[in-house]
Structures are given as C-alpha cells and as structure tokens.
C-alpha cells in the first residue's frame, strides 16, 4: 500500500478524486496535445522544491498568493480587481526573473503543472468536505492548501486561482479546449 498509515476512507476518497480529475483532464484531446507540447526538464517534485532553494522565489510566491487570498476574500469587485492586478504584476515580475535564471522551459513547465494541479486540488478539497474527512487539513482555507507555498507551490497557487475563478464566474473547463499552452492566469479577465 502506498500510504499504509492511512486507513480511513474519508482520507482516501479525496486522493482518489484528485487523481481522477487528472484522468478527466487528459481525456480532453486538445488539453492532452497542449500538455505534450511542453518540454519537461525537471520532475514535478523537484520543481515544487524551488522555493526552498531560492528565497527570492519563495518571497515572490508569498506575495502572489497573498494577493490571490485577498482577492478571494474581497467584499466588492473593485477591491477584488485591485488585488488581481497586484497578483498579475507580481506574477509577471517573478516569471521574468525565472525566465532569466532558469529558462523558458522551466516557466512553461510550472504553468503546465499549475494548470493540471489547480482543479485536481480543488476537487480533492471539495470531496473531502463532502465526505467529512477526518484529516484536519481538509478545510477550504487551511494553511496546507491555501498558503504553504514553500511546499508544492503550484498546487497552492493553482487551488487559489480556481477559488478565484469560481468567485468571478469563470468557466472551469477553460484550459481543456485549446491545443495551445496557456498560463492559468491568462484566463483572468478584469476591466
């Protein structure tokens, strides 16, 4: 067994749902084509460790994620849009530095991982809430799922982007119909 210490089905169900979402994502031929267009140089686990290795990256991701959390909790559209603009500005700046230091391939790889993990993580948490999971981390706004960018950062930012998209009324089926690679934030449309 992969996780022998997990014997409670309320913890297994969310993990299974997470992986099923990946299967659904790749069942869209256009999305599969877009994912195959990415060159993968580092393993997902290695890339998720970059914030621990590069303090400037961790700091930038915290700034981005804080903007996402503020946008999600904003009381009105104007306030939300201000935080979204800040997020997009921080993200653009960080990606430019990543492009300079790590290369375009790593940036695109991050974007592909974030897109893949965003909806999978969101559905994992939602299914955990539905089955009343015994795992204390399964709350919609837990530190583990919403803020811990030093570990699995593209899971965190992707999850929070999906939460923002739901608040904004963005169709969650968006990335699965294009054969072209696009960053998840490119689906944000604000005035």
Residue ranges and their predicted role:
Residues 27-102, 106-136:
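Post-HExxH zinc-binding segment in Zn-dependent metallohydrolases
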Residues 5-8, 26, 46, 59, ...:
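Acidic-enriched, low-complexity/disordered segments with a strong bias for Aspartate over Glutamate
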């Amino acid at each position: 067994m992969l996780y022998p210490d997990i014997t409670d089905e309320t913890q297994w169900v969310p993990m299974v749902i997470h992986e099923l979402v990946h299967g659904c994502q790749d069942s869209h031929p256009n999305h599969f084509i877009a994912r195959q267009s990415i060159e993968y140089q580092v393993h997902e686990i290695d890339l998720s460790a970059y914030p621990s290795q590069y303090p400037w990256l961790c700091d930038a991701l915290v700034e981005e994620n804080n903007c996402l959390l503020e946008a999600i909790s904003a009381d009105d559209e104007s306030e939300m849009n201000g935080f979204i603009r800040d997020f997009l500005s921080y993200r653009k700046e960080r990606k430019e530095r990543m492009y300079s230091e790590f290369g375009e391939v790593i940036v695109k790889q991050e974007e592909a991982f974030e897109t893949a993990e965003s909806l999978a993580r969101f559905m994992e948490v939602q299914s955990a809430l539905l089955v009343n999971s015994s795992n204390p981390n399964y709350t919609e706004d837990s530190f583990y799922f919403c803020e811990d960018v030093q570990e699995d950062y593209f899971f965190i930012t992707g999850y929070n982007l999906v939460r923002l998209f739901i608040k904004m009324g963005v169709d969650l089926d968006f990335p699965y119909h294009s054969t072209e690679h696009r960053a998840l934030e490119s689906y944000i449309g604000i005035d």
